[in-house]
Amino acid sequence: FIPSVAGLLMEKELAHLGKVLEKPEKPFVVIIGGAKVTDKIGIIENLLDTVDTILIGGGMANTFLLAEGNMIGKSLVEEEKVDLAREILEEAKKLNVNILLPVDCVTAFGLEDKEGIETCLVSQVKDDKMILDIGPETVKLYEKQLKNAKTVVWNGPMGVFEIDEFSHGTEGVAKAVANSEAFSIVGGGDSMAALKKVGLSYKITHISTGGGASLEFLEGKVLPGIEALNDKEYDKSRRPVIIGNWKMHMNKNDTKNFF
């Protein structure tokens, strides 16, 4: 039998993501966005020992802003994660990791509100409004950090990207990542869509198509598909195959049923 091996796409994913985990060139900047802290907390915790700067945006930034004592109106927030966000901010300080949060934001009464859109400092969010994007000053702040970065990982939008009025922050970050000279990895549907929209996908070192599997890998988790490839003693009677797809989420039983 021929040995079981990873396909070329899977090999490429592991090579690029592995470089970030093992020995990233400094300064190492991570940009994390999206709606929930829950979805990305594992990445932040796993990279705290190696990252220099973390830039946070999207709905999850609201939880961190609240942890710092900011009033965020009717914005999306995970109240049960506020203490965890505060702990992460404190741990980052101990490790000399710079976590940057939005300094200004785009607000409105709701997703469909076009008349009440306004930009304000995060300290001036009105009680009846929602934060729906990072503001222009935050984009400039994040651009400054990315300009001198040598390694950049970006996953998640900075606002409600699918609505044009709240897509400018994500687009601004996309341009900043693409125009940096860093080794760059971008993952997540909205992040990739932003790059495509501004026509700069070609300037990214690696666009990850691993989805949830790549996130788990960055969290430091052992992925079943990789474990099975490395497990020389497991079920020696099995028929070895070449796996040519990005199916690292599959466990051994899932893989057996798949084939």
Predicted regions span which residues?
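Active-site loop-to-helix "anion-binding N-cap" substructures in soluble metabolic enzymes
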Residues: 1-259
